[in-house]
Amino acid sequence: MATVNTDATDKDISKFKVTFTLVVSGIECITGILGSGFITAIYGAEWARGKTLPTGDRIMLMLSFSRLLLQIWMMLENICSLLFRIVYNQNSVYILFKVITVFLNHSNLWFAAWLKVFYCLRIANFNHPLFFLMKRKIIVLMPWLLRLSVSVSLSFSFPLSRDVFNVYVNSSIPIPSSNSTEKKYFSETNMVNLVFFYNMGIFVPLIMFILAATLLILSLKRHTLHMGSNATGSRDPSMKAHIGAIKATSYFLILYIFNAIALFLSMSNIFDTYSSWNILCKIIMAAYPAGHSVQLILGNPGLRRAWKRFQHQVPLYLKGQTL
């Protein structure tokens, strides 16, 4: 059975690494919590008032709510793993964190993939019968596809609670040339089971996201070249919007892939627990949902207007509280 074994002591992580990781990932998580929380509040309020949300807004509501939970959970895990290492390295606690992290990440990747597929079908133009069929059916099928995504994420996350991770703490490791002892944290990861369940849970949404993003970029690029050939000029607002959409889609396609890779590397314990590479994985995992949430707000006219109203109302509210 292929396993990865790692061990670490309290001396392996410096105060600088702890502070750096908590500050950087904390800023990312708080940014993501504010962004995802804002989107959830806007669309959640409309849904609570009995309004029927359009399909795109419904996907964004589910994506933002799951990201809100994910970023809160990631921040909690970072605090626990760095400041309360003995508690975190209890097998039941460690497995609980990993299973929920994978479930929330898989759900997020599925929802992000469906959002990209939906926008691709709405915006892109391709003369293919399958594309036209999906264009007509996507609104009807989307509620069922979102529910199926949650079920699939759960199905490939829960098995990670058995025969994948094993961690323990030995508090009686003797220190050479000293009469004292130190704590040592051991972890074992069954790579065969992890690779199987992780890849099964992420393979389909990853391919969907890459395919939808690529088709969207090609369609927008083709339309932009057509506009350029008609001498509309690079200053045309429509062309600028298309170029901006191409850049945003390209950036988040790359970040989406890096996030999936970072999640796997972090889960597999290939790197030492407190190594710089593992810290980098944590930062990437926190950066993607935070950055995408901000981009969703800035790229959506309705959310952008709501954010400006919110920014205007907060100082007025704080001023009223001080009176």
UniProtKB/Swiss-Prot annotation:
Gene Ontology MF terms in the entry: bitter taste receptor activity; G protein-coupled receptor activity
Its annotated compartments are: Membrane
Q: Which residues lie on this side of the membrane: Extracellular?
A: 1-14, 80-100, 163-190, 269-276
Q: Name one Pfam family in it.
A: TAS2R
Glyco sites are at: 170, 179
Residue ranges crossing the lipid bilayer per the database entry: 15-35, 59-79, 101-121, 141-162, 191-211, 248-268, 277-297
Q: Which GO terms describe its biological process?
A: detection of chemical stimulus involved in sensory perception of bitter taste
Record keywords = G-protein coupled receptor, Glycoprotein, Membrane, Receptor, Sensory transduction, Taste, Transducer, Transmembrane, Transmembrane helix
Q: Which residues lie on this side of the membrane: Cytoplasmic?
A: 36-58, 122-140, 212-247, 298-323
GO cellular component terms? membrane; plasma membrane
Q: What is this entry's stated membrane topology? A: Multi-pass membrane protein
- The answer to whether keyword Transmembrane applies is yes
Q: What else is known?
A: Several bitter taste receptors are expressed in a single taste receptor cell.
Q: What does this protein do?
A: Gustducin-coupled receptor implicated in the perception of bitter compounds in the oral cavity and the gastrointestinal tract. Signals through PLCB2 and the calcium-regulated cation channel TRPM5.
Q: Which family does it belong to?
A: Belongs to the G-protein coupled receptor T2R family.
Q: Which PANTHER family match?
A: TASTE RECEPTOR TYPE 2, TASTE RECEPTOR TYPE 2 MEMBER 40
Recorded protein name is Taste receptor type 2 member 40
